A protein has these predicted regions:
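Conserved "landmark" site that anchors the functional core of diverse proteins
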Residues: 1-61
């Protein structure tokens, strides 16, 4: 897993395979961190967008 900044209020999570991406997206969808605005899944990534930069650490913990 690799975390890449994506602007002031988002982080892109890169995963090794589709299975990992599905599990992460499901978990984040069922138990979103406070301030999560959007989750954008792709082939092996999930973009996590939050309301404020202060909320990023909780979103990726």
């Amino acid at each position: 897993m690799r975390l890449l900044p994506a602007g002031r209020t988002a982080v892109l999570v890169e995963l090794d395979d589709v299975g990992q991406r599905r599990r992460l997206h499901r978990t984040l969808s069922e138990h979103p961190a406070v301030g999560t605005v959007d989750l954008v899944p792709a082939q092996t990534t999930v973009l996590i967008d939050v309301e404020s930069p202060d909320q990023l650490p909780a979103a990726v913990a």
